[in-house]
């Protein structure tokens, strides 16, 4: 797959902004993979810090243009089973605080009322995107790495960046809810 760099740079897959994004993406995925058994307060604390950092690093990724019609990651590492394990572990920890109302979703265009969303599904969706990206980087095939950067940036702008912003609002609400703080 051939890619044209919009910003023109030498080895763009090793630029500081890209490597910092890879680092934060790997931290996010590793935390969610080890989430089972953690307390809600710890999960909220870590996610309230990682998600804004991911968002920031996503905005700093260089934009590349794919030169052919294929716009998929070179490899899908996350299976449906992996996704469900992550989502269910988060849902179990979030329990009755998993659901939230969201107005910044595609379905809202066809509704007069907010749409029900879940913290667990949004975090798992972001996990899937970032884990697939990190896996491609781990393989070390430079052409695939370029494609992965292009795709993860494009998907940040179109999908997971909005999910990160939406779920951060819900996480903030749960983390700083006065009733929950009294229980701690």
Model-based region annotation:
Residues 20, 33-36, 42, 57, ...:
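Glutamate identity and glutamate-enriched acidic tracts
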Residues 3-9, 114, 129-184:
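Acidic, proline/glycine-rich low-complexity IDRs
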Residues 20-27, 46-56, 85, 89-92, ...:
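Charged, amphipathic alpha-helical oligomerization/scaffolding segments
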Residues 63-134:
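Long amphipathic alpha-helical segments
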Residues 5-9, 24, 31, 67, ...:
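Residue-level signal for well-ordered alpha-helical segments
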Residues 3-6, 13, 35, 46, ...:
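Weak global preference for isoleucine
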Residues 8-78:
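N-terminal interaction modules that seed assembly of large macromolecular complexes
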Residues 11, 37-40, 44, 72-80, ...:
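Short, charged/polar micro-motifs that form catalytic or ligand-binding hotspots
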């Amino acid at each position: 797959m051939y890619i044209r760099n919009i910003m023109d740079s030498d080895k763009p897959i090793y630029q500081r902004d890209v490597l910092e994004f890879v680092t934060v993406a790997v931290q996010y995925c590793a935390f969610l993979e080890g989430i089972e058994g953690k307390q809600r307060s710890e999960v909220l604390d870590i996610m309230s810090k990682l998600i804004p950092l991911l968002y920031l690093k996503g905005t700093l990724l260089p934009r590349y243009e794919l030169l052919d019609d294929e716009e998929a990651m070179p490899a899908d590492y996350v299976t449906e089973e992996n996704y469900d394990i992550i989502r269910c572990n988060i849902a179990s920890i979030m329990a009755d605080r998993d659901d939230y109302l969201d107005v910044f979703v595609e379905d809202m265009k066809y509704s007069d009322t907010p749409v029900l969303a879940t913290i667990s599904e949004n975090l798992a969706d972001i996990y899937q995107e970032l884990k697939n990206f990190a896996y491609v980087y781990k393989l070390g095939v430079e052409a695939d790495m370029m494609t992965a950067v292009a795709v993860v940036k494009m998907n940040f702008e179109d999908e997971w960046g909005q999910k990160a912003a939406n779920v951060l609002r819900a996480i903030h609400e749960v983390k700083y809810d006065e009733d929950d703080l009294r229980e701690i």
